[in-house]
Amino acid sequence: MAPKKDGKATGAPQGFTPERFEKELKELATRAQEDTFTKRFMGQGFVYFQTLLLLGLLGVASSASQLNLSPIFGSIPSAVTHTTALKAACFIGWAGNLMLRMVLPMSTSQLLPVIALNIPAIQFLLGTFTDRLGSWWGPLIIEGFTLFPLAIVSAASVADVLEDADLSALPKFVADAAPGIVSWGLFRLAENQSMEKLQGVIGSTFVFTRVGIEVVLGAIYAIMAPSKYLVLAIPALLHTAVLNTHVMTPMATDALNSTLTAQNWTLLERRESLTGYVSVIESLERGYRVMRCDHSLLGGQWVQLNGRRVSEPIYGVFVMLEAVRLIEREAPLPDSEANALVIGLGIGTTPSAFVSHGIDTTVVEIDPVVYEFAQKYFDLRENKPAAVADAVSYTADLVKQSKTYDYIVHDVFTGGAEPVDLFTLEFLQGLGDLLKDDGVIAINYAGDFGLPTPQLVYRTIKKVFPSCRIFRESPRDEANVEKWGSDFTNMVIFCRKTPGEVTFRNPKQKDFLRSQVRQALLLPKYEIKEQVFLEDEVTDVLSKNETSKVTKWHQDSAAGHWKIMRSVLPGTIWEQW
């Protein structure tokens, strides 16, 4: 007989022991804590992601605004009021976010794409009034209707988002101040970085053109906050697509040419590049063409004269630079044995002449589009391809290679002011190292003689090159000085590396290259005595670490240059791009 089973339970099932139950409770509690932490972490991460995205987009929009103003005003006038007004706009948006939330029929995030998508059309329409607005009020008013509303609403949106930021771990005074201060710093970082990056890719595709960047920004804002209010941007989008000649498309270019042809001008080609908006335009009535970069001219030449085809420079300063060949030496130097370094190409007037004379000529030009257009539209002559590079680093490499030259031509200019880095003592000393002992340098300087800058630049040049003579492109015109409020002109400074008199031999017929313009302008005429620049006891020079000495006067110089450019070409040429 089988034994009887014991009716007493030997113990509770393993899954229901008190120890097991307690363990499960602890696990549930831990999981609940983890879920709360994960949610909080994800929530805070999203807050800061939105903040960074809004600030980054505003930084890019700020850079795009400046890029769109530079063809109409130049980069320097465009920037005069830019940062100050942006500070005011961001402060208004940051401080007034609650008011905007109450009065707007939509959220600030929904308003952002409406503003952004309207910007290209507003810039175009207001740009047609720049002759009347001038170079100071013009940028301020245009950005006042475009970038600054975007900045106000962006700052308000950031303030709204950061209301959900958990700053309880910080002291109260830090938590109160940090969001605004850090947001402004991040915006400025985004603005500076975006401008630097955009200049490297500008013009490479439609997305990276001036108007293209703004259209893409508007699309991103719309994706972030889609709403029924986007219909308010449809008229502006249609204008940008059909009527805005600033858009870099074949249709817009054809429309622009139709407008220009009615005024006896034609656009041969245009491109956006790292130094600015570059184009070649031709006067059908007067028979000359010029290369434009933003709101300045890099040079020009006659192509039709009295019904016959010609190729003559129209600006005397570039012909004057060729006179560096005429400076007398102890031992005459045949052109076939000479070599030259030309810094800054423009349309290539001076290097083409050197090559025509048989001089071995090296050209360094930073902008590949300028080089391409000089080849394509201005009969650029070469005996070797130009070096497309930054002049500072390129000449430093030449010094390391112990290269030397008989002639150096320094011919650089940017939108109403000298490029400071190329007039510093350190850069000029590098050119001195590249110049042979009996070599000669010609430096083209464009600036306002009513400002201290020309004196400072000349003292710096004299620190390196002991013997110099200075010539204006044209005599001082008191009527123009009164009209424009400045004495802005080109001057060419001819210098020797070693002490000795700077004298010019009389040009021969072959020096003129069968050019009537060279016959009239090759030999410099309007000399300025160096005492004009050295009459006071000031001895300071322009060093690499002290460029602020010059930049503080750039605004006045650029304003004078803007007025002159508006008298050289009609305002509609500048405004239409």
What feature does the model see in each segment?
Residues 2-152:
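Membrane-anchoring hydrophobic segments
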Residues 1-5, 574-577:
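A positional/structural detector of protein chain ends, strongest at the extreme C-terminus
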Residues 95-108, 155-170, 195:
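Cytoplasmic membrane-interface regions of multi-pass membrane proteins
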Residues 18-58, 62-85, 167-177, 190-302, ...:
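Soluble small-group transferase modules, centered on the S-adenosyl donor enzyme superfamily
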Residues 264-462, 466, 474-481:
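Soluble catalytic regions of membrane-associated enzymes that act on cell-envelope
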Residues 94, 152-157, 211-219:
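Transmembrane alpha-helices and membrane-interface helical segments
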Residues 108-122, 143-150, 169-187, 233-241:
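Transmembrane alpha-helical segments of multi-pass membrane proteins
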